[in-house]
């Protein structure tokens, strides 16, 4: 044996061996119980980073342990089409080539998307293979595979028929860069807030002299103001309720109204009410019957409804900068204060999210989610750490309907077709939609449209939220919807052999940031279509941060090069180092010293093995060290029991630290020294 452990050479040898021999392939074996782990499908745009390393190391750990214990272990890999992220990548790629998306047909753009996917989409899976992830690589699933696409469409139609999916107009989160709607869970906030300015504007009274001072962080939206609200209990303004003031710059009169939502302590205690551009203002507007005027285009520029020609076509943030001078010129700006503000940004593009009144497709979540709430709160599906149940409980008791439509082309196209009158027909295929249309025409004594060849219907241009496909992950990686029963609205699990054998899976490893985006919705979908839970346990990892507490990211320049570290410490050294410092749920402060400890540990095991291999084999019973053997055997069994107990209770870092102590101290420093020839 070589004196020094060559991690790079050994790991390469075994990862290639496992792939060539399909070591981790799993098929149904009724003589053994299954142990299944589903990989949280990384984005098709993704490359391996330290978050993936931690997550996949834990999954690999669980799956190899199960395999050693005799389970039929199956780790299912796959990738997500990642609608917003992928479309943004392709749009950027085309921009570099001088091509605009708007100049392409839908089919032409999708050809570019598939071309990009084929070229770059498998990178992260290839990287996982390289580092020896023990997946069944014959089971790779992509969320735009034909069978998966059909399943997503089938679920949309089914939920529409059951009354859970509807189309409605309400305030949504709008990404001006991607020009698409976002769910609340796709909006992120800087923990420390962001620097902003509070503008104190003068709204002059229509009757008499003087003005009302109103504080706002968004002066560019004054053109959509419909009222100024004050708290009905605020003695300063009671006498003004019902009077009118003028919007600066356009001199449009609006009323002063009373609403208990207004915070008397913020700013001046007066709130400009802009129903089209703020969710709280929208709700105030609904209570008071205010008009809703949207002054922003989809790209975040001001439109002609702002009634101020100089700003039409300009970006919202440019207007915010320029409006300050305009307000000063007419003496309508009292002062500006620097503040720290909570600003929502798109998780995918980092664009500041714009509240926008929009017609979108929604899922009614209140009734659909009841079973999921019950099974988590009763620990039928267990959360680790358990304190995440508190967050789950709060979110579920305040659950809102899910906006599932996205103004994109890459993804699962919404299966709704519109006639010339704006009526829509939902079906799994265009043929089904045309059958409904023909029935409608017949019922209204109108002539036949001539079927699909007549071309009278047009399909909805939008696609579904990415999560509206990935919530079916535990079902469709096993092709479950092939056995969907239209009469019952369920999957016939008894006919789906893989689903019946592998579901529920044993554990899923993920971050708490997608508890609602993904974990909760998978539980909802599984009970809706199989009456089974998707997994027994959910193991929430923490976020990998630097020593300053910042999340590791390329943008901050604080994310080390993974492959340089693999060359330096070996993949097993990194796995041990990362898992040993990651108590369940707690964020991890990345320190290269932990990887060094992992590398030294693998070297220690190698050297111990080299030492034993150098000894001569002696026939017969060794009575000289019998007491030592008895002592060590008892110690070994005690440590094995403790190790397994820690793992079963998901105390992974404790298990690894105890293992380290046992190998380094008990085995190497004592036992081997005591029995060596």
What is the meaning of each model-derived region?
Residues 4, 13, 17-21, 91-211, ...:
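Residue patterns forming the tRNA-binding/recognition surfaces of aminoacyl-tRNA synthetases
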Residues 31-32, 40-41, 76-87, 140-148, ...:
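Short, solvent-exposed turn/loop segments enriched in Gly/Ser/Thr/Pro and often Arg
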Residues 52-54, 279-284, 520-529, 659:
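Alpha-helical support elements that line or immediately flank enzyme active sites
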């Amino acid at each position: 044996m070589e004196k020094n452990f060559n991690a790079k050479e050994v790991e390469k040898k075994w990862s290639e061996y496992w792939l060539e021999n399909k070591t981790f392939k799993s098929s149904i074996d009724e003589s053994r119980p299954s142990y299944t782990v589903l990989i949280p499908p990384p984005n098709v745009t993704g490359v391996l980073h330290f978050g993936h390393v931690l997550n996949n190391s834990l999954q690999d750990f669980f799956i190899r342990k199960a395999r050693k214990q005799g389970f039929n272990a199956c780790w299912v890999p796959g990738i997500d089409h990642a609608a917003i992220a992928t479309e943004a990548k392709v749009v950027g790629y085309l921009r570099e080539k001088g091509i605009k998306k708007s100049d392409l047909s839908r089919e032409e753009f999708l050809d570019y998307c598939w071309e990009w996917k084929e070229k770059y989409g498998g990178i992260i899976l290839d990287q996982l293979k390289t580092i020896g992830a023990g997946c069944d690589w014959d089971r790779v699933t992509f969320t735009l595979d034909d069978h998966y696409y059909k399943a997503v469409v089938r679920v949309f139609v089914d939920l529409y028929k059951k009354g859970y999916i509807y189309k409605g107009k309400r305030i949504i989160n709008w990404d001006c860069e991607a020009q698409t709607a976002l769910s609340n869970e796709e909006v992120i906030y800087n923990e420390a807030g962001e620097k902003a300015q509070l503008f104190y504007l003068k709204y002059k009274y229509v009757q008499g002299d003087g003005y009302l001072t109103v504080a706002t962080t968004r002066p560019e939206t004054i053109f959509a103001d419909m009222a100024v609200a004050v708290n009905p209990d605020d003695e300063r303004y009671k006498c003004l309720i019902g009077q009118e003031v003028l919007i600066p710059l356009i001199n449009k009169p609006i009323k002063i109204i009373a609403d208990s939502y207004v915070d008397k302590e913020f700013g001046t205690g007066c709130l400009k009410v802009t129903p089209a551009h703020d969710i709280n203002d929208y709700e105030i507007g609904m209570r008071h019957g205010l008009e809703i005027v949207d002054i922003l285009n989809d790209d975040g520029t001001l439109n002609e409804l702002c009634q101020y020609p100089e700003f039409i076509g300009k970006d919202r943030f440019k207007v915010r900068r320029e409006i300050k001078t305009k307000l000063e010129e007419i003496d309508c700006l009292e002062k500006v204060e620097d503040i720290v503000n909570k600003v929502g940004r798109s998780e995918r593009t980092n664009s500041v999210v714009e509240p926008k009144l929009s017609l979108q497709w929604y899922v009614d979540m209140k009734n659909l989610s009841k079973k999921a709430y019950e099974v988590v709160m009763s620990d039928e599906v267990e959360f680790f750490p358990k304190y995440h149940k508190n967050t789950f409980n709060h979110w579920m008791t305040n659950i809102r309907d899910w906006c599932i439509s996205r103004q994109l082309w890459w993804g699962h196209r919404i299966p709704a077709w519109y006639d010339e009158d704006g009526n829509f027909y939902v079906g799994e295929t265009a043929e089904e939609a045309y059958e409904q249309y023909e029935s409608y025409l017949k019922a209204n004594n109108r002539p036949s449209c001539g079927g699909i060849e007549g071309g009278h219907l047009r399909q909805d241009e939008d696609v579904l939220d990415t999560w509206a496909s990935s919530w079916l992950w535990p079902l469709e990686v096993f092709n479950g919807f092939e056995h969907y029963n239209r009469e019952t609205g369920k999957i016939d699990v008894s006919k789906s052999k893989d689903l019946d054998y592998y579901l529920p899976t044993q554990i899923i490893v993920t971050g708490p940031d997608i508890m609602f985006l993904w974990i909760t919705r998978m539980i909802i979908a599984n009970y809706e279509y199989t009456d089974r839970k998707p997994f027994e346990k959910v193991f929430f990892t923490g976020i990998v941060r630097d020593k300053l507490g910042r999340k590791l990211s390329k943008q901050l320049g604080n994310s080390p090069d993974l492959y340089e570290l693999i060359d330096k410490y070996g993949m097993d050294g990194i796995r041990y180092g990362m898992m040993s410092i990651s108590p369940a749920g707690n964020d991890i402060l990345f320190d290269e010293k932990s990887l060094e400890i992992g590398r030294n540990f693998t070297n220690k095991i190698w050297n111990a093995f080299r030492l034993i291999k150098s000894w001569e084999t002696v026939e017969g019973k060794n009575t000289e060290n019998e007491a030592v053997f008895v002592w060590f055997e008892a110690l070994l069994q005690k440590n094995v029991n403790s190790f397994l107990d820690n793992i079963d209770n998901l105390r992974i870092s404790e298990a690894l630290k105890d293992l380290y102590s046992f190998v380094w101290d008990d085995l190497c420093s004592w036992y081997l020294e005591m029995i060596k020839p």
